[in-house]
């Protein structure tokens, strides 16, 4: 292990370590309770109705956003960075995507559909996905404003100003909403 600050932790007896660990555990539990409160507050944030009928490009051609849910009540969108003029996807996004095949199965059993969306053309996404050995659902938003409307892609003008930054069906028929 390399330490960048050049300091070394104190070496102690097992009893000293145990006492320090117990004190630290008290702080960890406080943090857990605080994190639980913050998570509850995040879940209680209001939703924003999705006003546009976004249509994405995928394996079957054009698909409306509401159909991306595949009959489930929630949709998790991973905004995979892959611009139209790139030859391959973002390396960091690719790292995370290596786990999407199994995560998708887990989420499906919990009434959640997980997909990736990128601005690159669908054919380019599909070729990269095949090369990487992935089978998760991936759609192109290259023919709509989705990425721009939800602040994950930016025009040069927006980049010069304030840049900001989730979707679910609720018991209101086919209306969609954006969440945290």
Regions found by a protein language model. Give the residues of each.
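Short, charged, low-complexity amphipathic alpha-helix
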Residues: 1-24
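A common structural microfeature
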Residues: 14, 21, 28, 51-53, ...
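Amphipathic alpha-helical coiled-coil segments
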Residues: 17-34, 38
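Coiled-coil termination/hinge junctions
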Residues: 40-59
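A short beta-strand-turn-helix
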Residues: 55-85
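Conserved beta-strand termini and adjacent loop/short-helix elements that scaffold enzyme active sites
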Residues: 59, 117, 139-141
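Short, thiol/selenol-centered motifs that function as redox-active sites or metal-ligating centers
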Residues: 73-125
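Thiol/selenol-based redox catalytic cores and closely related redox-interacting motifs
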Residues: 131, 135-180
């Amino acid at each position: 292990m390399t330490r960048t600050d050049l300091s070394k932790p104190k070496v102690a007896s097992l009893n000293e370590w145990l006492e320090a660990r117990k004190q630290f555990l008290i702080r960890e539990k406080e943090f857990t309770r605080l994190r639980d409160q913050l998570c509850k507050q995040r879940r209680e944030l209001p939703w924003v109705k999705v006003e546009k009928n976004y249509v994405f490009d995928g394996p079957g051609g054009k698909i409306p956003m509401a159909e991306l849910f595949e009959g489930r009540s929630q949709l998790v969108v991973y905004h995979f960075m892959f611009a139209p003029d790139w030859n391959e996807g973002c390396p960091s996004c690719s790292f995370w995507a290596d786990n999407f095949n199994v995560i998708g199965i887990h989420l499906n059993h919990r009434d959640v559909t997980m997909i990736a969306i990128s601005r690159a053309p669908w054919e380019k996404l599909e070729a990269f996905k095949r090369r990487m050995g992935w089978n998760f659902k991936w759609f192109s938003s290259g023919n709509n404003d989705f990425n721009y409307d939800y602040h994950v892609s930016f025009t040069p003008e927006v980049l010069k100003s304030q840049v900001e930054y989730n979707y679910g069906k609720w018991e209101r028929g086919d209306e969609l909403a954006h969440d945290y």
